[in-house]
Amino acid sequence: MKSDDELKNENPELYRVARESGTEAPFKGKYVDEKADGMYHCAVCNASLFSSDTKFESNSGWPSFTDPANREAVTLHEDTSGGMSRVEVRCKNCGAHLGHVFSDGPEKDGKTCDRFCINSVSLELKPKV
């Protein structure tokens, strides 16, 4: 895993989002419209986070998933920044800010799923081979 100084120098946008809890512009991230099968990993530490099997089109402007690949891969934190009350999602392994989770995902088996709204820059897709 790269140090914060290395991260800041090599990828300032990733540093801003992952370490300063920033948000990338909507509809600009490289994975918003991605359809490839694979596993999305943390761009900071390479931990497995989200499977493409749970990715869906939310029209929010960010990649959205119904569940992490493993609930133990992420941690959830109260976020009241910007005058809003939200639930922040972080990588459990390195603490990188990934995005937020909302309770307005698609319906499955008569229940509304969560919508993990994740910044593309915080992810690295490793396609299935």
Regions found by a protein language model. Name each.
Residues M1-V129:
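A short Gly-Trp-Pro
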